[in-house]
């Protein structure tokens, strides 16, 4: 039963209850008396259950992996990368580097407050630098980042505790409610519309996460908000035996290697390494992708990581988002509605994999809801060439990652094609309309998403205090 809506007007409305939305709501609740509403089209964190283990993917609408309080990060393995510039994240777009570093430190304090703390990586900085030195001898760069790992099994309770605290401070949460559009009058935002009616506010933070990227693009076009194209990353999820990654991951939990390919001179990189982890399915309704995660207590015999090739379209086609979606749809078609799984040895030999060939290998795939096939039928030639070239180069630094038995799942696509144009407070050309997190392209991981939410929250509080001060003076 849908609860009756008692209040329609708020000081601040936040669209999305992922890391950005939660941290924005927390900061507003902790540092002001403003009325705040958080709207998410998914469920509360502890009610989000993916049926894939029992029934396979039944294409829940919305997907419980991607939507709901905690966002897509809820079912990640909780890798926290405390760095101001990584991948599509670059906080120096909005502030000087010293302030960007301080903002990241501020997020860590909040994470710690709600028990989201863990072992710090690298465990040995000198050893990490030596690994980077050896990689650079092979023409490969390694980014050394302060990291913590929380575990997929711990995240839901942490997020639920944070949401409960925020609600206790007076923030209102609406679950299973989808935002359609914003209401604008004379260049200022005054509210929004959802499947349950209209709400009114002069301050709206748009933070729907990666799954909302396409919606944000259409929202921007409809309301005349400028956007810029930043490209996408397309590739595979690589799965190897733990023994191949053990020495490396004991020092650097999530090593990020950058490899420049020989034929096309494109950048490929590793991302989201999960030692003892599991490959997971992501359902984007019109197509499927893969991802990976790891628990703190439950471990598999395998390690997985994303291996991605960067794509930036310019002329005549600039819509990187649409290009990525077309790849996702084609790959899903080839896989019969499922991701495609292939042994690396089969890919190199130009033949499709079969379950018999996979079973005869020593790596047992952690995601079974797949179709054994040929990734070469699903990914563009340039991307596939980059991935094979890059993996062979990476094998010089991590011997064994390019073995015949290595498993590849496709597609893995990181959508950050569109970045909404904002000022340094992440406010758009529409007064009172702010952006935060992965969806509008201003962040690319859990920590940076939370950091970008603090920026508009601080601006809103400052503006409210200034308005209050002016009213006091006129009395």
Specify the residue positions occupied by each region the protein language model found.
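Residues forming the flavin
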Residues: 2-87, 126-475
């Amino acid at each position: 039963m849908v609860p009756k809506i008692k209040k329609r007007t708020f000081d601040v409305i936040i669209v999305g209850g992922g890391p950005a939305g939660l941290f924005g709501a927390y900061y507003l609740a902790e540092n002001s008396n403003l009325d705040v509403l958080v709207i998410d089209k998914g469920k509360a964190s502890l009610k989000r259950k993916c049926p894939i283990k029992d029934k396979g993917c039944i294409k829940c609408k919305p997907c419980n992996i991607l939507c709901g309080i905690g966002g897509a990060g809820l079912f990640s393995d909780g890798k926290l990368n405390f760095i101001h510039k990584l991948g599509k994240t670059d906080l120096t777009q909005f502030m000087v580097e010293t302030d960007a570093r301080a903002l990241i430190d501020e997020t860590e304090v909040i994470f710690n407050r709600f028990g989201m703390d863990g072992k710090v990586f690298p465990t040995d900085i000198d050893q990490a630098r030596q690994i980077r030195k050896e990689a650079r001898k092979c023409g490969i760069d390694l980014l050394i980042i302060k990291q913590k790992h929380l575990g997929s099994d711990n995240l839901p309770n942490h997020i639920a505790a944070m949401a409960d605290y925020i609600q206790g401070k007076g923030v209102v949460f609406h679950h299973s409610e989808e935002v359609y559009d914003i209401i604008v009058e004379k260049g200022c935002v005054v509210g929004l519309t959802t499947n349950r009616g209209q709400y009114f506010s002069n301050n709206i933070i748009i933070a729907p996460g990666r799954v909302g990227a396409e919606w944000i693009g259409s929202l921007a076009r409809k309301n005349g908000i400028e956007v810029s194209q930043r490209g996408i990353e397309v590739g595979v999820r690589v799965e190897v035996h733990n023994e191949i990654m053990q020495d490396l991951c004991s020092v650097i939990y999530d090593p990020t290697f950058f490899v420049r390919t020989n034929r096309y001179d494109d950048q490929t990189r590793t991302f989201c390494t999960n030692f003892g982890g599991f490959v997971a399915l992501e359902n984007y309704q019109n197509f499927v992708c893969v991802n990976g995660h790891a628990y703190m207590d439950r471990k598999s015999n395998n390690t997985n990581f994303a291996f991605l090739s960067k794509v930036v379209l310019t002329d005549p086609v600039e819509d990187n988002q649409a290009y990525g979606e077309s790849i996702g749809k084609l790959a899903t078609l080839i896989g019969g509605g499922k991701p495609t799984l292939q042994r690396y040895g089969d890919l190199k030999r130009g033949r499709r994999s079969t379950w018999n060939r996979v079973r005869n290998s020593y790596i047992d795939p952690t995601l079974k809801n797949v179709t054994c096939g040929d990734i070469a039928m699903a990914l563009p030639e340039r991307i596939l060439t980059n991935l094979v070239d890059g993996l062979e180069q990476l094998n010089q630094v991590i011997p064994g990652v390019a073995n015949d038995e290595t498993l590849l799942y496709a597609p893995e696509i990181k959508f950050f094609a569109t970045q909404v144009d904002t000022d340094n407070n992440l406010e758009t050309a529409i007064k009172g309309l702010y952006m935060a997190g992965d969806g509008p392209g201003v962040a690319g991981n859990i920590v940076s998403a939370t950091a970008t939410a603090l920026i508009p929250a601080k601006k809103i509080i400052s503006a409210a205090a200034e308005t209050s001060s002016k009213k006091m003076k006129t009395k």
